[in-house]
């Protein structure tokens, strides 16, 4: 079925809507534990509302959910002990998508957001240089995020990952 841009984003909104999240199923997933394990700054490529919903189910609040274009809030949070910030660097489905959406989904959007000296690259590099990062659920395969991490890592910086056993 062919969709125009507006209809395409309407379908994406519907599919990834927070109302589609099954609370009982979410409580069985590892993501449900994130609010119990981390009470600080969270970075994600996910544009859905699962992390926010997990915080709600755990009766915890995030101070701010940011996405590209919120650099000032991101940089302010980096310097605080308990920012309770979720930064969704591929955008946020909850912001109401349209054909000029800020989520990163298409090849064209990836090229635009990840181009040299883009605000997104600047934001991620600052995060990687300012904080130790724990990667959860990331494959850590060679991709744009790993390329940024490699270019941003300074001698002596420490980052962590929890990976699936194969």
Say what each PLM segment does:
Residues 1-132, 136-166:
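Conserved catalytic-core helix/loop/strand module for nucleotide-ribose chemistry
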């Amino acid at each position: 079925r062919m969709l125009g841009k507006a209809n395409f984003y309407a379908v994406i909104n519907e599919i990834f809507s927070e109302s589609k999240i099954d609370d009982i199923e979410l409580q069985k997933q590892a993501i449900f534990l994130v609010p119990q394990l981390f009470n600080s700054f969270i970075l994600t490529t996910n544009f859905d509302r699962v992390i926010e919903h997990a915080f709600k189910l755990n009766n915890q609040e995030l101070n701010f959910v940011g996405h590209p274009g919120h650099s000032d809030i991101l940089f302010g949070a980096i310097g605080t002990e308990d920012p309770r910030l979720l930064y969704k660097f591929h955008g946020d489905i909850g912001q109401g998508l349209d054909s000029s959406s800020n989520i990163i989904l298409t090849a064209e959007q990836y090229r635009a957001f990840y181009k040299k000296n883009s605000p997104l690259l600047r934001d991620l590099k600052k995060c990687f240089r300012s904080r130790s990062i724990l990667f959860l659920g990331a494959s850590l395969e060679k991709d744009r995020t790993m390329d940024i991490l490699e270019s941003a890592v300074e001698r002596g910086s420490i980052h962590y990952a929890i990976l699936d056993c194969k």
